[in-house]
């Protein structure tokens, strides 16, 4: 195998992102940060994985914070370090898409699909800003590639690698909690060894998650992946539908009366006043989880409306635009209004046509994964950023459709 396709894919992924990085360099660490950035800074200054020194937190999905910590430690908190390293991750993602297509379809389909997937206008902008989906993309492709390899080669050590990869994906996005079961369902068969491989996958995933869960019990007070069930409540309460329908996001849902501070708010308060606000994360986790279950039980009709709304927001070809966002009214909005819909509509149409041209196991796995993302969105919330890490599956199908049409035309011209 020559290196030329790898170089092409790497260049296509890197060049536009480098251009965006240079244009956006002043905003990388100011206008578009998230709570993982705060946690990384506190950890490096005090050794506490939290928002307030000496007060550990589980109020987040921890993977992205752990990704930022070594970057800040080695290179300081600099826009170029975050941007360049995240571009490297995006390049790695594109190369994995190429490898997936090359192995399961053809080299040319893999090459074009990797280029199509990495040129998603939404990703080109977001990949250089601080957002945890940069890791979701890489891990998503790795999971699909490893699962497809294991489906044809029953390797226990590869099963362990897949298990750890799934655990990392869950630590980055708890919406993927049940993904290991889906992967194992595609691995098991009549042969006894397939069940052994599936067992290794589940064991590897569980063992990789245990340290974080135990840490939360010791440091925070409860066995959990994250205590932030308030995010689930924001997506499941009587005010959610109207808030989202008004063009806002779940963060704009009105808080409860006399609501106690969140760990994130406590961190911001500590920065300004130097005082520690008491926060019982485990009690809050149980409280908001109870409210969510109560809402589902008492308002099934409202929940059905929210599920439909979330599905549309997940699959809307036009990237979700919420009021009050930092980039409102600028060039990013122009991309959302014109470039993103043009890209997404073409991708979706060709993907539907091309799914029948992919190898059966890959096509079925891809459809199931996208259906899983839709079901999770119906339970939580839907947004473009939750879907795009998996758009490479659609890009593979779309490219297969294009090449099928090209080959058919060539055969007709020869005949």
Give the ranges of each region predicted by the language model:
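Transmembrane-helix motifs of polytopic, lipid-linked glycan transferases
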Residues: 84-105, 142, 146, 349, ...
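Transmembrane-helix signature of polytopic, membrane-embedded enzymes
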Residues: 3-9, 97-119, 137-138, 152-158, ...
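Short helix- or helix-capping micro-motifs
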Residues: 13-16, 110-121, 125, 138, ...
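Membrane-interface anchor segments at the N-terminal boundary of transmembrane helices
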Residues: 80-81, 287-288, 294-366
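Short hydrophobic/aromatic helix or loop-helix immediately within or flanking a transmembrane segment
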Residues: 35-45, 55-77, 311
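Membrane-interface transmembrane helices that cradle and orient dolichyl/undecaprenyl
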Residues: 107, 143-159, 169, 187-192
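Membrane-embedded glycan-lipid processing machinery
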Residues: 21, 56, 60, 71, ...
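Membrane-proximal stem/loop segments at transmembrane-domain junctions that anchor or position
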Residues: 224-314
């Amino acid at each position: 195998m020559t290196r030329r396709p790898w170089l092409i894919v790497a260049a296509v992924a890197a060049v536009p992102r480098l251009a965006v990085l240079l244009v956006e360099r002043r905003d990388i660490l100011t206008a578009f940060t998230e709570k993982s950035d705060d946690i990384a800074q506190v950890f490096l200054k005090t050794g506490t994985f939290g928002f307030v020194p000496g007060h550990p937190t589980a109020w987040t999905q921890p993977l992205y914070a752990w990704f930022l910590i070594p970057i800040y430690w080695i290179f300081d908190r600099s826009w170029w370090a975050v941007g360049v390293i995240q571009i490297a991750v995006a390049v790695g993602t594109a190369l994995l898409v190429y490898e997936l297509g090359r192995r399961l379809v053809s080299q040319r389909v893999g090459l074009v699909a990797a280029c199509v997937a990495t040129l998603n206008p939404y990703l080109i902008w977001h990949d250089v800003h601080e957002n945890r989906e940069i890791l979701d993309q890489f891990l998503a492709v790795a999971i699909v590639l490893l699962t497809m390899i294991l489906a044809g080669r029953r390797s226990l050590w590869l099963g362990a690698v897949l298990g750890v990869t799934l655990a990392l994906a869950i630590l980055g996005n708890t919406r993927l909690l049940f993904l290991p079961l889906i992967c194992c369902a595609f691995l098991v068969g009549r042969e006894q060894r397939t069940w052994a491989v599936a067992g290794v996958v589940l064991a590897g995933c569980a063992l990789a998650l245990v340290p974080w869960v135990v840490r939360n019990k010791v440091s925070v007070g409860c066995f959990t992946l994250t205590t932030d069930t308030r995010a689930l409540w924001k997506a499941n309460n009587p005010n959610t539908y109207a808030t989202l329908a008004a063009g806002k996001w779940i963060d704009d849902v009105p808080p409860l009366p006399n609501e106690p501070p969140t760990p994130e708010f406590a961190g911001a308060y500590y920065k300004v006043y130097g005082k520690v606000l008491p926060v019982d994360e485990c009690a809050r986790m149980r409280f908001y989880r109870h409210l969510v279950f109560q809402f589902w039980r008492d308002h099934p009709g409202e929940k059905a409306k929210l599920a439909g709304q979330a599905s549309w927001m997940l699959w809307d070809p036009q990237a979700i635009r919420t009021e009050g966002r930092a980039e409102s009214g600028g060039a990013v909005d122009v991309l959302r209004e014109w470039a993103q819909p043009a890209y997404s509509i073409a991708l979706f149409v060709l993907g539907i046509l091309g799914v029948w041209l992919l190898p059966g196991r890959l096509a079925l796995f891809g459809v199931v994964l996208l259906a899983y993302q839709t079901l999770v969105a119906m339970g939580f919330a839907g947004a473009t950023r939750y879907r795009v890490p998996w758009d490479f599956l659609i890009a593979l199908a779309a490219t297969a459709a294009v090449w099928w049409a090209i080959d058919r035309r060539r055969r007709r011209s020869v005949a």
